[in-house]
Amino acid sequence: MKGHACTAEVAVLGAGPAGVATACALRRLGHTVTLFGCGRRGTLEGLSARALALLQHLGLTHAAACAMQPAERGGRWGGSPVSAGHEFIVDRLILDRALRDDAAAYGVCLEEEFALAIEPDAGGYRVRTRSGTYRAGVLIDARGRRSGRALGRGPSLIALSQRLSAVRARQPRTLIWPLDDGWCWFASDGAGGAVVQLIAASRGLARGATPAQRLRECLEALAACESALRDARLEGEPHARAASARLSAAAPAPGYVRAGDAGVSMEPLSGHGLYEALSSAGAASAAAHTHLAGHSWEPVERFLTERACERWRTAIARAAAFYEQQAAATPTTFWRQCAGAYAELLEPRAPEERPEGAWHLRPVLNGSVIEMRRVAVTRERPRGVWQVDQVELARLEEFLLAEPAAGVAQAARYLACSPAAVASAVGWLRAHGLLKSGGHAPQTRAVNR
């Protein structure tokens, strides 16, 4: 196609988990999608049980099949042994290949090249590559941490990793171990594949020791709890990448959406990176679908921005807790500075004066569309709650105000929901001061916007 333009409804930049999941979701909605990107450098990564469940839920069956035998977790943190939980060890090169197979199965057009430039175009965007120019109505940026200017950033960290050889075969396993100036992670897939990774302050890696020397220090520390590492040797070349938690604009322009790490990148210590990347696909695909349908961009931008800020704050709180725990056990400069930096990012905002329960018009994710709906805003749920047990709260409240003598059964018929679900929603409204009488309050499951 060199020299002329190829057109699709959506261009997705980045063929990792977030990009592929979003591209496949858009194909299920009937849109034409071109996906740009190549597989990452081969290394081992941890895939949590809930990330695996999400791959399966999203229909990414080839990628889900990469998770084989669960790996036990071990090591030390906060002065205590780590032994709880497990994760699956996947080779990122194989995972990315499987993701591309999933994309092909859904009919996504895959271009194994990178975008050299992105330019606004009439009604959309132009993507320039080495082979030519592509046009699309919507642009999904899923290129990871390097995408866009950071609006928020955690401590400046870098991850240094390298493959290992001469690791004795055993069951899949991961280990975490704190150092005075960082922490290291080891993963073995049980079939001879193994990797060691060091996370340290960016400035700390320039303190004189070579990358290979620093990684050998990690191996020596890890060998204290894993005898199989005593004879391990570094293989190939070390690989460095940015590892700072990062927040970017989720919707920088109409028809332009950031997904996965491009919008919110997690602190590596949290172990939730792949899950968060996959979970962004629903909102990103709905944003694209809503824009292509000709609806207003303002609710889409607001929804994506508020969602990203909420995910960012959750990620920062998780990181702050981890670093504070280790700083108490190892009060060195690295741990105290990282813990302090996250605590500063987490400083409480001035609280809004808000009654216990109030109704507001807010954007919500309604299936595959983002639209404005009345939601119940509470102190615990400042973004608002739209549904409880799949019952739309505003419609329920409107019905009960119009029919004050009606019972749960009548409301259930009106809303086409089960009486049990309606009773649950009535109980939730009463508990938050949004309904003065009627119903009971069983256990409920609230749905955020």
Task: List each language-model region with its residue ranges.
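C-terminal helical "tail/cap" subdomain of flavin- and related membrane-associated enzymes
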Residues: H289-R373
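Predominantly flavin-linked oxidoreductase catalytic cores and closely associated redox partners
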Residues: A104-R230, L247, V264
